[in-house]
């Protein structure tokens, strides 16, 4: 499979080992994991950062290698159940932040053709993601604009 905005192929990475149950060294109560996930979300962490925190720091000193194996639910599902989810999906939010940084860079450096193309590609990805999420996680009327993104993220 090729990359979206280049002519190169993607590099394949290693697969996660298949497992049906969490390892025995990571025996943590499901409720404790869910409470920690909600607590981290309220501190401002994104779902991917929450997974990393639980993997590295754990709950009550015991690492949680995989939240879905331990609880049967993904981090985003836990956040939805507890009404702690973000207004925007994480991938869309990250792309919007990148587009804002690129737009500010272009305002300071109008002759930078390489980053002008990077901005065009990023905004193209944003529009594609907005179409994907519209009606499900975003309003039907949602459209991307730089000003709207800047207002939402600041």
UniProtKB/Swiss-Prot annotation:
InterPro entries, per the entry: Ribosomal_uS15 (IPR000589), Ribosomal_uS15_arc_euk (IPR023029), Ribosomal_uS15_N (IPR012606), uS15_NS1_RNA-bd_sf (IPR009068)
GO cellular component, one term: cytosolic small ribosomal subunit
Keyword Ribosomal protein: yes
A GO MF term: small ribosomal subunit rRNA binding
Matching SMART domains: Ribosomal_S13_N, Ribosomal_S15
Domain of life assignment: Archaea
Ribonucleoprotein in keyword set: yes
Signal sequence extent: none
Region described as Disordered: 1-32
Biological processes, Gene Ontology terms: translation
Biased composition (Acidic residues): 21-32
Keywords, in A-Z order: Ribonucleoprotein, Ribosomal protein
Compositionally biased tracts (Basic residues): 1-10
Entries under CDD domains matching the protein: Ribosomal_S15p_S13e
Family: Belongs to the universal ribosomal protein uS15 family.
NCBIfam families: PRK08561.1 (NF006331)
Subunit organization: Part of the 30S ribosomal subunit.
Protein name: Small ribosomal subunit protein uS15
Source organism of the structure: Natronomonas pharaonis (strain ATCC 35678 / DSM 2160 / CIP 103997 / JCM 8858 / NBRC 14720 / NCIMB 2260 / Gabara) (Halobacterium pharaonis)
The gene coding this protein: rps15
